[in-house]
Swiss-Prot record:
Residues 202-217 have a biased composition (Polar residues). One of its GO terms (biological process) is regulation of transcription by RNA polymerase II. Its main location: nucleus. The lineage of its organism: Eukaryota, Metazoa, Chordata, Craniata, Vertebrata. This is Homeobox protein Hox-C6a. Residues 142-201 bind DNA. Disulfide bonds: none annotated. Residues 200-231 are annotated as: Disordered. SMART domains: HOX. The gene is hoxc6a.
Amino acid sequence: MNSYFANPSLSCHLSGGQEVLPNMPLNSTTYDSVRHFSSYGTTVTQNRIYASPFYSPQDNVVFGSSRGPYEYGSNVFLQDKDVLPSCRQTSMGLNAQSHVAQEYNLEQARAGTQDQKANNIQIYPWMQRMNSHSGVGYGSDRRRGRQIYSRYQTLELEKEFHFNRYLTRRRRIEIANALCLTERQIKIWFQNRRMKWKKETNLTSTVPGTESAGTPQETEKETEEEPKKKD
């Protein structure tokens, strides 16, 4: 078994008696730089290369011209280089996924805080929209429906109208706060109620006039008939 290290890329195999470096003479000056490293690797004495006693031959190391089971060629380094970009891609993908997950968590937290704020807002009765068909939709082109008042609201408004047909703004604000209505709603209600009251008064005033107009004609006819009977 040869004791020198063999290069797997070389096509020729050197025998024990051939020189390792044929282009250079085997003299002491050539191997001066190698002799002071006698404790490591191979040593050169008497124009021969043999293994150092510090290293014992093993199966996983290549000695001589034969190749062991764990041989490392030039392709190994290329394969390692090819693995690096894939590792970088996977690391970049993991970083992107973690960044997306963090953004999603932040958005969920913001949405939760906004929902909590919306739920904590106190809604007063005057803030609710009461004069629409379904109570939903605030578009300008949406036709407003008729306001529906409760029995309690109508009763209180009728009482107020019985004493005062015209309200001051201060009194209107007080009634609006008491009945959970707006000033505009109370103003419109009083306007409609005054119109209704005027119609009622006009009807009551016209009915007695028609009756009084008919009675004189009947009396005249009766007076004319009485003298004829006497004759």
